[in-house]
Amino acid sequence: TWDSRARLLDGLLENLLEFRSFRFIRLKAFVRPDMLVGPEIGRFPDASKVLTGAIDLSWPRAQLFGLLWQYLLNAPTAEGQPGFRELCKQVFHQRLGLHEGVWHGSDEMNTDEETQRSIFEVLAGEFMGSNRLRGYPYTWLPNHLADAYGQVSPRSFLAALREAAEDTDR
């Protein structure tokens, strides 16, 4: 039940507060933001000391696609097949960087949603079906993976794309 979860979460937060007194031990807890909402959370002395240190780990759409590009830029390619790096250079005229053995996309590729949309449309198609009635893959994917607060986790985003790619290969 929600009450038992709230008590467990309060216990976790109280432990985090206790460990603040140890100089060389810093605990971190990853908690879904929706679990921190409600009057029953943080009803113990000095709860605000723990709750005010919360950091938002949300991933906007541009960052999710930037993560996808990073993943694809560094993925191995099949023998004789052009990889994502070649596609970015030849088709999209993107300048890529190689730093310590890791490929990086351009700032435009990682932050500009129009550039990201055009790249993703080449990979996935312009429409979900044969026309726009079923939606556009660039917006459809994050919208359908989002939770009630509009948040998408990088793991579910990449997993959905991996599953779609494997399904396409079959």
Regions found by a protein language model. Give the residues of each.
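The catalytic "switch" region of P-loop NTPases
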Residues: 2-132
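P-loop NTPase catalytic cores that bind/hydrolyze ATP
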Residues: 117-170
